[in-house]
């Protein structure tokens, strides 16, 4: 008899004898987070679509091409329909949850972690599935560069406890809206001069958000981006000072890092510090953890101005 249905493309089953591996990773993640003062939070698998459009960014690939959205009719005649989306990442849902549940009215900083499934409609390949699983953590209420360093240290500890070796830490600052405006002008002027060489997606990005071109995986676009203006040359005094202090904290903690000005991350909410832990053995999908600061997101979602940072 033929199988009625198979698992959806880009998903996976975990056989009983393999589940222990998942338990091991999840246990180490929870133990590491709690050692650093983080508490577990849980939030829905789906949220109002507007949450992700507002936070992740209307022009990002995640929102434009990869989100699983559904319209739920709330009445018999189809009026008053609600738009929902399966979460493509965890930061937006966690931020919404801490605002709605009043955690930011309690003692700060608030530190939460989560172990969740996320969903993106992208081409399945090695290291990229349409349903994937994340360990993430968020800290709300500290603007200090030392908080960035502590978050990076926690990720490093977790990776070491997993026994993963040959990992490189890349860091960058993408500034704030104030200094990024001048950088966008310089970046757009540079790529405009080579527009016809860019891939079709990056020609669209040039009009909407030229920083996204730096994140393109096309070898041609990567080669063009090698000589592009560097964000570190455009940082305001506050952002530059923050980044220099972060490096000093990492040096004091004996955490090795590489400054990589091409790291911009793929989501619009990031400000100042961004970082990635990259495996030197996996290849094109070598980033095993990414994160950074997003000081404007809480206010953007309707909360009081609150500095924040996180990773997944």
Where would I find each of the regions flagged by the language model?
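TRNA-recognition modules of translation machinery and tRNA-sensing kinases, especially anticodon-binding
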Residues: 1-312
